Curated annotation (Swiss-Prot):
The protein, known as: V-type ATP synthase beta chain
Keywords attached to this entry: ATP synthesis, Hydrogen ion transport, Ion transport, Transport
Homology family: Belongs to the ATPase alpha/beta chains family.
Keyword Transport found: yes
Organism: Anaeromyxobacter sp. (strain Fw109-5)
Superkingdom assignment: Bacteria
Function: Produces ATP from ADP in the presence of a proton gradient across the membrane. The V-type beta chain is a regulatory subunit.
Length: 460
């Protein structure tokens, strides 16, 4: 190695996306390098492992045509950063934050490390207030709160991407506060890539959205940096400009598969299902960047979307994500088969922070008791449906038939809203219309004061 130029001529070996170098003193973990190929073409890389004077470099672009013996590697002394500015809103970028829309790069206001700055836990404020997604099964029953991280658990083939795009197009904060969306897609096939952009343009929301798109044909290494670049952009918008930022990440399963691919290339001892043992820690470095900071007006809210391999809720990806995040929205294959969209199964779904965003001063005073009653009746209706499959609906009693009808109407009218935007007021009114078909004694979870206030309101 030339100690003046910090240049290494000739690499020791290459394995997949990794380049191994010998005799590299004073290298730093996370340091960026430039790799010059025999034909003069340059690639970028990052040091991800140090073992004495031997280093492993993660090549950030395609490695095809890279001959190790003829490569020239220069250590830059820099770490991975992203040039950020408010001008990133309305732009389409690749997974590393480079423009792909044919326009010049936004003028940088700052250059920030993509791994984020450590946040003092004593400065964190608890999530509060409501983000309206326009999706009844989320807003009404699993309310999303500013500063929360609420993942969507999907099965292969379900319209999770469509739902993610719908949330980007419809989401808003109430009260006129400044709001923006950062959308990051990892491993997106061209069809989805094009569909996302078309949906955002058609809905007229691209000007308030920063779009990071890592395509399926892009190197897996880029996939590991995409959510970090997106969150770095979100942190700048939230904590430097005071915006409430919703970050939608899809698909985190593609991210985890790229993490596994790199770990195997490094000959690491695999953990569950071949994923690296540090995957929990790695996911936490992404999910825990959501939140609010005391004394700062902005916030970051995350909606990561992931596909459960083999529809398995105990698979390491959803399992570990569930430990870090604050609830989950679960998509159902059964509802999808019956033509219900979005196919959100509200029974296993949960927003642990719903109480911080629903109720008086945030949505409506009747929100929580109404949601509790709808949950309880729908759960009983599902039980009756299973019983009817055994004994036949003709053998059900009058109360069971009412519950069965309620469950069907709940899925059809409240959950199955289609692509239309539905405000929280419309969602709650839809819930009350469903309850109006039931006798008063069935509404045991709604306090008498709420029922009386509702009755008086209906008389006006």
């Amino acid at each position: 190695m030339d100690l003046v130029t910090r240049r290494v001529r000739g690499a020791d070996a290459i394995a997949g996306p990794l380049l191994f170098l010998e005799g590299v003193p004073r290298a730093r973990l996370g340091e960026l390098v430039r790799i010059r190929m025999a034909g003069g073409e340059e690639r970028r890389g990052q040091i991800i492992e140090l073992s004495g004077a031997r280093v492993a470099v993660q090549v950030l672009e395609e490695t095809r045509g890279l001959a190790p013996a003829r490569a020239e590697v220069t250590l830059t002394g820099e770490v991975a950063t992203l040039a950020v500015s408010r001008g990133m809103l309305g732009r389409v970028l690749d997974g590393l934050g480079r423009p792909t829309d044919g326009l010049p790069a936004p003028i940088a206001e700052a250059r920030l490390p993509i791994h984020g700055a450590a946040l003092n836990v004593t400065r964190r404020e608890k999530p509060a207030d409501f983000i309206e997604t326009g999706v009844s099964a989320i807003d009404g029953l699993n309310t999303l709160v500013r500063g929360q991280k609420l993942p969507v658990f999907s099965c292969a083939g379900l319209p999770a991407g469509r739902l993610a795009g719908q949330i980007v197009c419809q989401a808003r904060v109430r009260g006129g506060e400044r709001f923006a969306v950062v959308f990051a897609a990892m491993g997106a096939p061209f069809r989805e890539y094009d569909a996302y952009l078309e949906a955002f343009r058609r809905a007229g929301v691209l000007d308030r959205t920063a779009v990071f798109l890592n395509r399926a044909e892009d190197p897996p290494i880029e996939r590991l940096m995409t959510p970090r670049c997106a969150l770095t952009c979100a942190e700048h918008l939230a904590f430097s400009h005071g915006l409430h930022v919703l970050v939608v990440l899809t698909d985190m399963t593609s991210y985890c598969e790229a993490l596994r691919e790199v770990a195997l290339a490094r000959d690491e001892v695999p953990g569950r299902r071949g994923y690296p043992g540090y995957m929990y820690t790695d996911l936490a470095t992404i999910y825990e960047r959501a939140g609010r900071i005391a004394g700062r007006p902005g916030s970051i809210t995350q909606v990561p979307v992931l596909t459960m391999p083999d529809d398995d809720l105990t698979h390491p990806i959803p399992d570990l994500s569930g430990y870090i995040t604050e609830g989950q929205i679960v998509l159902s294959r059964e509802l999808d088969r019956r033509g219900v969209y979005p196919p959100i199964d509200v029974l296993p779904s949960l927003s642990r922070l719903m109480g911080l965003g629903a109720g008086p001063g945030r949505t409506r005073a009747d929100h929580r008791p109404l949601a509790d009653q709808l949950y309880a009746l729908y759960a009983r209706g599902r039980d009756v449906r299973r019983m009817a499959a055994i004994v036949g609906s003709a053998n059900l009693g009058e109360e069971e038939r009412r519950l069965l009808e309620f469950g069907d109407r709940f899925e059809r009218e409240l959950v199955g809203q289609g692509d239309a935007f539905r405000s929280i007021e419309d969602t709650l009114e839809t819930g009350w219309r469903l309850l109006a078909q039931l006798p008063p004694e069935a509404l045991a979870r709604i306090p008498a004061a709420v029922l009386e206030a509702r009755r008086k309101e209906g008389q006006r």
